Each structure stands twice: as C-alpha cells, then as structure tokens.
C-alpha cells in the first residue's frame, strides 16, 4: 500500500520547525498568498468599489476535466472575509465541462475581487493535477496497477497537489522525506552498498521507534537479488524497459525468503508479497505496457511538475 500520511512525524536530526497539521499548512499557504498578492490592499478595487457594495460571483468552468479544490476555495473566502457566503453546486472529483457553474459566492464586492485570483490559482492548479491524474489512471483500467505521484511538486503546494492526485483517482507516494524510507543510488553509494544501507535503515527505525516502509531503488538483476535478500517492503525498478520490467516482476514474484528471516524481520517478504514500483521516464503512452507487466505502482512526476491548469473564470452574476 502507499505510504501513510503522518503529519506528526519528524526526526530528531531535523533543523526545521516540527511538522504542522494539514489545516496549519493550508493556512500558512493562504497567508503567504494574500501577502504577495493583496499586500496592504487592492489599489484598483479600493479606489473604484464602495466599501458597502454587495454582489455575487460564480465560478464558471471553461474546459473539460476533473474539478478539485472546492473546499480549499472555501477556506480562501473564509480567511479573507468570514461573512462571504459560498453555495456549492459541484463538488471535488466531479467530471466537469465548459459552462458548468461550480459555486456562487456572495458578499462584499471588495472581498470577492481581492480573493478572486488566489482562489483561481489554487482551483486551476488542483483541477489540472486531478485531470492529468484521471487521464493516467484511466489508461490502467482493468489492471491492479496504481499511479503514484512524486515529490516533484510546487513549493508550498505539495499538500494540495497530492490531495488533487487522490481526487483524480491516483494514489500518493510518500508525502515528504519523513514518512517513508526510500533508499536510492546515492544513499547506497554513501552507505557502502545495498545490504549496509538497508540494515542501517532498519536499525535507525528500531532505535527511533519508527514504523516506516522501506523501499529500495534498483537498476539491474543483481541489485534486485540484493534487495530481496536484505528484506525490503517495496522495490523500485528505475528506468527499466517494459521487457526488463516483465522479467524483473517474474523474478521477484518467484523469490522465497528464508523462514527464519520471515519470522524475525517485518520488512522481509516472499516475492509475491513485495510491492513493485516502476519509475523513470514513463509517459502516458507507455504507461499501460508497464502496468501489464504486473507492477503494483507506477510513479509519474508529470502529474504535478508538468501539468496545465484547468481553465475557469470567476464572474459577476
């Protein structure tokens, strides 16, 4: 299964602030968004719109896709002006088309105009991510394989982009560096090898009371064998072709772990129980070929780093 979200997890070696809750992270993002956009006030709106002017605006969808971010939009309005009233007609996860009205907001016109761009930036971004994810996951219809996101996200918006991936039907990989151990080539090189890196990870988890999945990135059959013998929860096949992936999946599934190791090491599994992830250069056109190899997950950075926002507007009504 994908790494679980643990917002309270942080290592004693960290030199940043302790992890914040979901709501705190969103509030911090909105505080920054208002600071950089509104500043000490919208000069145009404050100079042209009377303070007591009341009105309504509606969010109009202009492109087909998956709607995401409605509840975050509500937080935008509530944070700026708690008296704004939002009436929702289309919720997160819905398939939308041009002309659909997702919600109507009424209240002070000054508040509507000053929250418009921040709300649209978030909604367009999240809906774009959800729409892209839906397109990828749809290519895997009928297969067990799940599309995963990555850490290639917009700084400050990771939480929202990963929520959008789930809204679009995908699954989340680790949220950050804190909620899963993913041993990559650099870790292996610095640790002195795969057995050393995996054992060090297990020792660290035990010493620090961490119950984290351990995943290992591999590049060839020899590294697959070392991963299986070391005992890991998931193996990432990095930049394998579909042909090599099929061979690797068959090889992993046939592995039988020693009974003593199975009994003593919770990260040790028979090959049929090891999660397998494909990663590296996989496009929407090659996605299904990898899924048909029988992998459990395919991680795709493009879900968040190369996405186009879904077109929509916020107009007076």
What are these regions (language model features)?
Residues 16-230, 234, 246-251, 274-278, ...:
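Acidic/glycine-rich phosphate/pyrophosphate-binding loops and surrounding catalytic core
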Residues 239, 280, 302-303:
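Short secondary-structure boundary segments
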């Amino acid at each position: 299964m994908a790494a679980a979200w643990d917002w309270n997890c942080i290592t004693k070696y960290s030199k940043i602030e302790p992890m914040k809750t979901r709501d705190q992270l969103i509030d911090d993002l909105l505080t920054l968004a208002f600071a950089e956009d509104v500043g000490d006030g919208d000069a145009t709106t404050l100079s042209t719109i009377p303070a007591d002017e009341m009105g309504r605006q509606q969010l109009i969808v202009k492109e087909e896709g998956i709607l995401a971010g409605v509840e975050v939009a509500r937080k935008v309005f509530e944070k700026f002006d708690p008296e704004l009233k939002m009436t929702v007609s289309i919720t997160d996860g819905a398939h939308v088309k041009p002309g659909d009205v997702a919600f109507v907001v009424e209240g002070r016109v000054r508040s509507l105009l000053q929250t418009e761009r921040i709300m649209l930036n978030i909604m367009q971004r999240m809906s774009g991510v959800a729409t892209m994810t839906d397109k990828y996951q749809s290519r895997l219809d009928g297969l067990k394989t799940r599309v995963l996101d990555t850490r290639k996200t917009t700084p400050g918006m990771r939480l929202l982009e990963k929520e959008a991936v789930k809204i679009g039907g995908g699954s989340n990989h680790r949220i950050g560096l804190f909620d899963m151990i993913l041993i990559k080539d650099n870790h292996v090189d610095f640790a002195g090898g795969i057995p050393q890196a995996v054992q060090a990870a297990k020792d660290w988890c035990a010493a620090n009371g961490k119950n984290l999945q351990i995943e290992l990135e591999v590049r060839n059959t020899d590294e697959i064998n070392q991963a299986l013998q070391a005992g890991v929860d998931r193996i990432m096949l990095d930049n394998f072709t579909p042909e090599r992936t099929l061979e690797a999946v068959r090889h992993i599934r046939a592995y039988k772990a020693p009974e003593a190791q199975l009994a003593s090491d919770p990260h040790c599994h028979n090959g049929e129980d090891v999660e397998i992830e494909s990663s590296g250069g996989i496009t929407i056109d090659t996605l299904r070929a990898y899924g048909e190899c029988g992998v459990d997950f395919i991680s795709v950075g493009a879900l968040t780093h190369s996405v186009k926002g879904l077109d929509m507007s916020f107009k007076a009504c």
